[in-house]
Amino acid sequence: GIVSGEIVDMQGMLSPQAWGELNFIADPQCNRCGFPFDFDTGDVNEGNICAGCHKNPPLFDKARSALIYDDASRNVILSFKHGDQTYALPSFMPWLQQAGRGILARSDYIIPVPLHRWRILRRRYNQSALIAKYLSREVHVPHLLDGLQRKRATQTQGHLNANEREKNVKNAFTVP
């Protein structure tokens, strides 16, 4: 299976143990960033916006994630991203479709985040572009591979906190 190397029914599937360790994000969640709430706030007027979005409103209207980023999901994501497990992509599609159900239907394009050319040479593929291409086919929304352009290389972000990540990618991209 993905990550564990256990025998599963089909290539790209997760073992029952790995599946059971994943924490999927479901409602209730922040209407803006998708941050999961422990309980429904009942705040109809504010539209269930988290404290982080109230304090520092993001530059986007809506974002969603399929999984809480923890040890279990990190293993799955990094195995795909760095471990050449691109065959796992079909397994991710239902997760991404469910997480993005309210966003994808209203989207004009699915736009991947471009990698710096040196990082593509090391990895041999851009995982974001693969996801965009595959998801585009699944949800019938065109993907636009050159919708963003990378202006400069950035350091890897795995060891950075949220503020450091924001600073790291600031002014790294442009819309052509």
Residue map of PLM features:
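Glycine-rich phosphate/pyrophosphate-handling loop used in enzymes and phosphotransfer proteins
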Residues: 1-176
